[in-house]
Curated annotation (Swiss-Prot):
Its cofactor is Zn(2+). One of its GO terms (molecular function) is rhamnulose-1-phosphate aldolase activity. Pathway: Carbohydrate degradation; L-rhamnose degradation; glycerone phosphate from L-rhamnose: step 3/3. It comes from Cronobacter sakazakii (strain ATCC BAA-894) (Enterobacter sakazakii). Its main location: cytoplasm. It is found in: Cytoplasm. It catalyses: L-rhamnulose 1-phosphate = (S)-lactaldehyde + dihydroxyacetone phosphate. It holds the Pfam family Aldolase_II. Keywords: Cytoplasm, Lyase, Metal-binding, Rhamnose metabolism, Zinc. This is Rhamnulose-1-phosphate aldolase. GO terms for cellular component: cytosol. The active site is at 117.
């Protein structure tokens, strides 16, 4: 067995994708995850890399990520199968030094390419790497059921959507005080939706794709998963509350302000002002 299969990053991706599938967020080949790695992370496994790595040109240059390593889920791969065959469903790649292409060094053992949302991932990675000082390393996309459901019935206004999620569960303001960004419905797998998402990623760690899914970021796979899980739990509560006739009482503006002060976070200005 290849030693890389027991590496912390492959095992972490196996757990994350399995958890996401068990949550019901990633039907069939839905969803995609990418994890930015350091050269030191992959160095011990170089002897298991492909001797002649495939080179694939990027649709847009990513000079901000030149030389960076990523572990990414594969295009058309089912999350429920990652745990069964990580070497086929995952891919380890490195962006070239000029940022124009990437080399596939390991994975996709039966052929294929990284996720079709790779452009969106790289655009968001570039932004989050800059705004977090290199701390954020994960971009996670999934089809979180209740967040999608709310995108059909709530006004697609980031302040209002954020405020309702904060009110749906006390922990939400603490976990994502910067609120949730929203892009218009757009065709997936395009540079356009990637650009719109990365623009929202400048000020948000969560970005809603209406009628489609959610993008989340964080320093680790656990943090990104936990962020989405928290928002989705609140969305589930809101779906139930709305189906029961709506709120009769909720967390007030003053209480949300006090919550932010207690945990040392600054709430999204537009959402707290409502």
């Amino acid at each position: 067995m290849q030693r890389i299969l027991s590496s912390w990053f492959v095992q972490g991706m196996v757990k994350a994708t399995s958890d996401m599938w068990l949550k019901g967020w990633d039907e069939r080949n839905g969803g995609n995850v990418s994890l930015r790695l350091d050269a030191a992370d992959v160095e011990p496994y170089r002897d298991e890399f492909y001797p002649a790595p495939r080179c694939v040109e990027l649709s847009q240059p990513r000079t901000e990520l030149a030389g960076c390593w990523f572990l990414v889920t594969g295009s058309g791969k089912f999350f429920r199968n990652v745990q069964l065959d990580p070497a086929d469903t995952l891919v380890l790649l490195q962006i070239t030094d000029d940022g124009m292409a990437y080399h596939i060094h390991w994975g996709l053992s039966n052929g294929g390419l990284p996720t079709s949302e790779l452009a969106s991932h790289f655009q968001s990675h570039a932004v989050r790497k800059a705004v977090s000082g290199g701390k954020d390393r994960v971009i996670m996309h999934c089809h979180a059921t209740n967040l999608i459901a709310l995108s059909f019935v709530l006004e697609l206004d980031e302040a209002r959507f954020t405020r309702l999620l904060w009110e749906g569960s006390t922990e939400c303001l603490v976990v994502f005080p910067d609120g949730i960004g929203i892009v218009p419905w757009m065709v997936p797998g395009t540079d356009g939706i990637g650009s719109a998402t990365s623009e929202q990623m400048k000020t948000h760690t969560l970005v809603l794709w209406p009628h489609h899914g959610i993008f989340g970021t964080g320093p680790t796979l656990d943090e990104a998963f936990g962020l989405i899980d928290t928002a989705e739990k609140s969305a589930e509560i809101l779906v139930k509350v709305l189906s029961m006739g709506g709120m009769k009482q909720t967390i007030t503006r003053e209480e949300l302000i006090a919550l932010g002060e207690r945990f040392g976070v600054t709430p999204h200005a537009g959402a707290i002002a409502l």
